[in-house]
Structure formats: structure tokens, C-alpha cells
Amino acid sequence: MLSCVFSDTIFLSSFLAVTLICMTTALWGTILLISKQPLLSESLSHASYPGLLVGALMAQYVFSLQASIFWIVLFGCAASVFGYGIIVFLGKVCKLHKDSALCFVLVVFFAIGVILASYVKESSPTLYNRINAYLYGQAATLGFLEATLAAIVFCASLFALWWWYRQIVVTTFDKDFAVTCGLKTVLYEALSLIFISLVIVSGVRSVGIVLISAMFVAPSLGARQLSDRLSTILILSAFFGGISGALGSYISVAFTCRAIIGQQAVPVTLPTGPLVVICAGLLAGLCLLFSPKSGWVIRFVRRKHFSFSKDQEHLLKVFWHISHNRLENISVRDFVCSYKYQEYFGPKPFPRWRVQILEWRGYVKKEQDYYRLTKKGRSEALRLVRAHRLWESYLVNSLDFSKESVHELAEEIEHVLTEELDHTLTEILNDPCYDPHRQIIPNKKKEV
């Protein structure tokens, strides 16, 4: 099937155009995301709509149709830049909130575009059908000329981001610092604006004005979950954008639905634009779920693992407190009736499977119906007791907490005491022997 699909030159032009456009939008979408204005692409895409219509009308009635793409791109970019100027004016002069300014430009320019589209529909139905693709996208109509334009814009974007990378990064992250360094921030902001407008205008026929902003946001959002380094985010974002464009284009051609009209099954081609956006959204969703650093699933697993480890350590401390009271052989009844078990687990029954895990790890040894701590388990329990009492001492002596309120806090943070932190606390507290409740703090050799 792949060979049949890619042997079609018409599809190949559309495939390359959509893929390159999605990669370019992902690159500049990363810049918008880092500069905390991801919704700017939404406003600029809607602002370009009347410009696209004016360009199409100019090409239809004033100039030759062969030059239509030039005038459409020119007037579309002009309208987009003009819309950005109004956003800046409303924010700086009228003191309007930025989100309000974005919404104002979006609805006003889009309304003007709808009015122009109504005029075109009455005066030239053929032209209306052609320009209607700008609103919802029609990737199947993209030919060699559009693919060439997409390649030029992509290569120009790569060159601009490579040549002015440091300047754009500094301007994006800290504009005041960039001004202090003597950088011409207005120049680099204008450069970014021109490229973003150019990408929007050259890409609206692929996914449409309504959906193109998703291709600015989704790939960069997914890439941001995987790295903190901007250069890596740019590469991953472009990769995700390219994968989304390629998959969406291929699925729209390779898989068709069949609608029953009357008594006949009519093939229905899936729209490319929405499929591209769905693929980008799925990739971003997977990154949000499974990102090694901040993915929801990974964080959920970490929380569950920490909660499980904390309960296991509490069980170990229960064993130690009972054995510390001269009861070496511990029955199930002694265990669940101890005050420490009641403090940690309340009325819960004896956690046999958890104790079996402690036994498997070599912390506890079972002899007939009794349990006893091993040397390894006693050492680990003393480490936890030392951590708890060190934290209590630090909270009382260094942070002026009352000794009545530090027990619960120490119960939470005793599980995160590393060797380095133990050494630091020991130095700060001058290696104390007793905690605020006059209980002995085990030494570093795990001895009391």
C-alpha cells in the first residue's frame, strides 16, 4: 500500500507540503511557548483571514491567476502583522489585558473575513470554493508550488533560528537583559513575527485557519515535557510536527470510510487537517502522560512507590520499637496491638504480604508463628529512627518549632534523609545525643 500511495505525484506534493509546514509551525511554536504567548498564533491566523481573501480577489480581478499565491501570501502576512500591531497597541496604549487584546483581534478580523467571504460567494462562486479551503484546510489541493513554498519557508526558518539563535533566545527568555546587552530586541521580535505570519499564511491550506494554531502548540508542548534544553526542544518539536503531518496525510489517503447513501456504499475520504491535529494531540498526550520527568503516569508511579516505601519503613520501625522494649519474638497479636502500629495503620489488619516483602529483603525473619528483626533490619530501622530524631532536633533547635508539633513533620520528612543530608544535619546540630523529647539518637554506626 505504501508504494502505491507514494507513487502518486499529486499525493507526494501534498505529503511533503503538509509535513514541512507542520515542522515549521512546530519550530516557531516552541518560541511562542517559551515566551509564554502560545495563543498568539490563534489570533494571528484569524487575523490573516481577511488578508488571504483580499489577496485572492486581487489575483482574480487585477493580476494573473498564475501569480495568485504571491498576492495571497503577501496580503495574508500584511493582515497578520497588522493584527499583531493592534494587539500591541491595545496592550500598551489602551492598557488592555493581553488575553483581551488577543480575543478582540481574533473575533474582529475573523468577522471581517466572513463578510468578505459572503461577498465573494455571491460575486464569484468558483473563487469562493477555492478560498474556502483556507478556513478548514484542503491538503489534497496542495501541489508542487505549495510544496516548494513550504520547503523555502522551512529552510529559511532553520537558517534564521541557527544564525540568530542566541539573540532570539535571549530576547525570548529575558527581554530586559537583552536590552541591557545592547541587542536590538525589536529587530528580533519583528523577525519572529514575520516568520510566524509567513508560516501561518503558507500553511492554512493544509489544516485550515481554525486548526493551524494547534500545530504551533501541540508538538512544542510535547517536546517541552521531554527536555529543559531549548535546542533539544526545537529538534523534538520539529520531529513531532513532521511525524504528525506525515501520519495525518498518509491516513487520510490510505484509509477511507464508507457511508451508506440510499442503497450504495460511497467512499468518504478522511480530512487531512483534523487527522494531522489528532496525531499531534496524541503525541503531546503521550508525552504528558509518560514523560520521564513530569509525566502524569510517572508521577503517579513515583507517588505510589514513595507511599509504599514509607509504609514498609513504618512497618520496620514498628518491629524495632517492639523489639526495643525487650520483646525479640514478635507475634501477630503483639504487632497489631502495639501503639506504633496503631499510630501508623490504625485498625487495619495485619499486613501479611507487606511483612513477607520485608522477610524477602532480609529485614525480618519468621520462626514458626513469630517474627524477629535480623541484623540488617535492625540497622535499617535504626537509620530511620536516627533520621526521625535528627529532624525533630533540627526543627526545634534551628527553626524554633515547639517540640510538641514536630513529631508529625518528622514522620513525613524522615524518609528523605540522604547520607549527605545526614552529615549536614549532624554538623549543624553538633552531633546531638538526644532529641527534644530526651530520647537517645542512634549514632552513625546504627547503635543506641
Curated annotation (Swiss-Prot):
UniProt topology in membrane: Multi-pass membrane protein
Keyword check for Nucleus: no
One GO BP annotation of this record: transmembrane transport
Entry's transmembrane regions: 15-35, 47-67, 69-89, 100-120, 144-164, 193-213, 233-253, 270-290
Gene Ontology molecular function, alphabetical: DNA-binding transcription factor activity; protein dimerization activity; transition metal ion binding
InterPro entries linked to this entry: ABC_BtuC-like, ABC_TroCD, Fe_dep_repressor, Fe_dep_repressor_sf, Iron_dep_repressor, WH-like_DNA-bd_sf
Keywords, alphabetical: Cell inner membrane, Cell membrane, Membrane, Transmembrane, Transmembrane helix, Transport
Cell compartments where the protein resides: Cell inner membrane
GO cellular component: ATP-binding cassette (ABC) transporter complex
Family from the record: Belongs to the ABC-3 integral membrane protein family.
PANTHER family for the chain: ABC-TRANSPORTER METAL-BINDING PROTEIN, METAL TRANSPORT SYSTEM MEMBRANE PROTEIN CT_069-RELATED
Biological function: Part of an ATP-driven transport system CPn_0346/CPn_0347/CPn_0348/CPn_0349 for a metal.
Protein name per Swiss-Prot or TrEMBL: Probable metal transport system membrane protein CPn_0347/CP_0413/CPj0347/CpB0354
Provenance organism: Chlamydia pneumoniae
